[in-house]
Amino acid sequence: MTAPEKPVKQEEMAALDVDSGGGGGGGGGHGEYLQQQQQHGNGAVAAAAAAQDTQPSPLALLAATCSKIGPPSPGDDEEEAAAAAGAPAAAGATGDLASAQLGGAPNRWEVLSATPTTIKDEAGNLVQIPSAATSSGQYVLPLQNLQNQQIFSVAPGSDSSNGTVSSVQYQVIPQIQSADGQQVQIGFTGSSDNGGINQESSQIQIIPGSNQTLLASGTPSANIQNLIPQTGQVQVQGVAIGGSSFPGQTQVVANVPLGLPGNITFVPINSVDLDSLGLSGSSQTMTAGINADGHLINTGQAMDSSDNSERTGERVSPDINETNTDTDLFVPTSSSSQLPVTIDSTGILQQNTNSLTTSSGQVHSSDLQGNYIQSPVSEETQAQNIQVSTAQPVVQHLQLQESQQPTSQAQIVQGITPQTIHGVQASGQNISQQALQNLQLQLNPGTFLIQAQTVTPSGQVTWQTFQVQGVQNLQNLQIQNTAAQQITLTPVQTLTLGQVAAGGAFTSTPVSLSTGQLPNLQTVTVNSIDSAGIQLHPGENADSPADIRIKEEEPDPEEWQLSGDSTLNTNDLTHLRVQVVDEEGDQQHQEGKRLRRVACTCPNCKEGGGRGTNLGKKKQHICHIPGCGKVYGKTSHLRAHLRWHSGERPFVCNWMYCGKRFTRSDELQRHRRTHTGEKKFVCPECSKRFMRSDHLAKHIKTHQNKKGIHSSSTVLASVEAARDDTLITAGGTTLILANIQQGSVSGIGTVNTSATSNQDILTNTEIPLQLVTVSGNETME
C-alpha cells in the first residue's frame, strides 16, 4: 500500500458507505484514502451526507451519536446511520486503533471505522454486516507528521487488557535523497501478500534507483543488482556520497579486523604531519661521490636545518651552550663499520680538522673527508664523548677539535672499535674529565651519507659508504658489527725455511709473509710451525743447509747407485750432504733413549759370552723366549723381536685418523707408503714400481728367467727415500735419493761397473748427495 498523496476531504469521507469495511488494501490507483469495498443503496449515502451537513465536524457527530440510547425511529434513519458509523470510532478512541480508520486534514487524523457496519433491511430492522478487511490491520502514515509523535496500535485478535499482542504488520516508506538528486528507496519484504515485514526474518533491502518506487514482493530476488541484504537489527546512520553529507547525519566509521603483521599503524593520509615524523617538505637530498682516496666529495646541495625542538622534545638548536646535557648517541648500521678515525703512535684518537662551518646550517665544504654527522659546537663546549656500541660495547672518548672561527661550527664525529681512547684533548686547550659531556647532534632532515672506515693494527684503512634517508633523531641508536673481517694474504715474497738438524729434529724459524705495498691487506707473521706435515718449497735463491739422515732397510742391499737415465739439477745439490748409517744408530735416535751402541743384554748373550754356538761365524743373537728360538744378526733386530713378544709398539703412525702402532720403524715407514701411495722401487726393465724391495726382487727374477741372464750381471736401481726426505723444487720436480747396488759413482748420471769392492765404496764418511729428478707429469707411486 502506498502513502496518500493528498489529505482525505470531508466530502469524500461522507460519501463512503458506513456499512462496508474500511481496512481494504489500497494500491497505486486508490492510495489517497482507505475506500470501503461495499455500498448498500442511495438512502444510506444520502443519510450520511445529511448528517455531515448538520454537524460541524465528525468528532462532534461521534460525541452526539454515542449519547443516544434506544431503538431508532423511522424518522431518524439518517442520524442513526451516522451514529452507527461513529460508534466504533468512540471505541477506537480508547486505544483500539485496529478497529478504526484515520482521516482528516494533513495535520490531524480522523478515525474511520473498520469494524462491522449496521444498516437497515427492507423490514426496517438493523443488520450488522462484517467487514472484509478486519484481519488486515494495515495503516498508511505520512513520515513528515510522525517525527515527535508516539503511536500505539493493537492488532485485531489481540487482547489489550492482558497485554498480549499478536504479530503486527506495518509498512513505512521513508524518502531519502542522495547528493546527486537521486532518491534512495528502502523496500521491506515479507511473507504476506500485502507487502509487510516478516518479523522472524527481519530483513531490510536498500534499492537505489532514479525514481521513488516501492517494490513489494514476498521474497527478494537473488538476481537483483545493487541489492544489499542485511540480517538482524541494522541501524542506518548517515551516508556521505561524493564528499557531501546530509544534515543531521554523522559519518560512519567501520572497524574491520585484518590479518596484518605487528607494529603497523594506519594513519589517514590527509592528516599526516611530516614534521612530526622528522621529514620536512623543504628538506633536500645531499648527494655525494667518492674520490680515489676514499673521501666523500659533496656536490654542493644544501640541507635544510629546520628546528623541530618543540614537536619532538629534543634540543637540536644550532648552538650547544648547556654543559649538563645527558644524551647518549647510538648509531645503527647493519654491516661492520666504524666511523672514520686515525690513530697515532701514542694511541690517541686523532681527528681530521675539516669542519662544516656555516651559520645557516648549510654545507659548503667541497671535500668531506669522512664527515657526515655534524654537530655545531659553541666556544663554551669543552669536549664531548660518544658511546658506540658494538658486539663488545666499549665507551669511546673522542677528540673534537674546534676550528678558528668563533661562530657555530659543525664538528666531525669519529669513532673506532675495538680500542678505547682515554686521553681527550681539544686543540688549543686542556680538558679535564669533569668537563666531558655527552654529545648532542643536530641532524638536518633529508638524505645524507655516512662514510665508515676500518683501521687495522698495521695502519691499513678500508672504506665503506652507506646512505641514510629521512633520519632526524639519532638517539638510542647503535652500531653493530655483524660481518667478520676477511683477511687476504698476498703471494709470498720472502720465505725463510726451517732447518733439519743433524739429529733429525726439525728446528722451525719464523716465516714472514710480506704483503708489500698492496692496499687493504694485513701483514701476518707466523711465529711457530709444526714439523708434522710440512713440505719444504725452496725457491731459486733459497739457501737452507740441512743434514739428511738416510736409513737403510734390512732386506735391501747395502750399496747405493744412480739409475742410468736419471738427471740432476746442480743448483738443488748445494750444501746438501748424505751420510749412510746403520739402522742401530737410527733406532737409537728414534727411541730417544740410547745415544751410543751398547751390548746385547739378552740372557743368551750374557750366558754364552756374547756369541752363538759357532765361534767361527758371525755373531748371532738368539731369542730367549721358550718355544721361539729365532736368530738375528743385529741387536736392534733382536730388540724389535722382543717388543713383538711383549706387545710393545712404540712407533705410531701420525697420519690423520690413523694412529696405528708398530714394533719396528721399517714397518712404520712401509705403512706410510700405503697412505701416500708411494712406490719407490722401480724395475729397470719395464719401469714398474713397487712399494717393497722384496716385491721388486721377485719381479726382477721373472725378467731373468725370460732372458736367461744371471742376476749378478744386471744393474738394479732402487730408489729409496723417506717421505720427509723428498724435496719438491719450485719448478715442480721431485728429487729423490738413489740407492747404489753395484759399482761406484764417478759422474752425474753415469754408473761405473768396475771391480771395486763394495766395502771400498760405502763407508761411514760423507759423500755428496746425488738426486734423481722426476718430472712433474710423472706419477709418483
UniProtKB/Swiss-Prot annotation:
Entry comment describing in which tissues the protein is expressed: Ubiquitously expressed.
InterPro entries on file: Znf_C2H2_sf, Znf_C2H2_type
Cross-link (Glycyl lysine isopeptide (Lys-Gly) (interchain with G-Cter in SUMO2)), chain numbering: K551, K593
GO cellular component: chromatin; cytosol; nucleoplasm; nucleus; PML body; protein-DNA complex; transcription repressor complex
Subcellular location: Nucleus; Nucleus, PML body
A single GO BP: natural killer cell differentiation
Keywords from the named record: Acetylation, Activator, DNA-binding, Isopeptide bond, Metal-binding, Nucleus, Phosphoprotein, Repeat, Repressor, Transcription, Transcription regulation, Ubl conjugation, Zinc, Zinc-finger
Location of the region described as Repressor domain in the Swiss-Prot/TrEMBL record: 534-620
Compositionally biased region (Low complexity): 32-53
Compositionally biased region (Gly residues): 20-31
Protein name stated in the entry: Transcription factor Sp3
Natural source organism: Homo sapiens (Human)
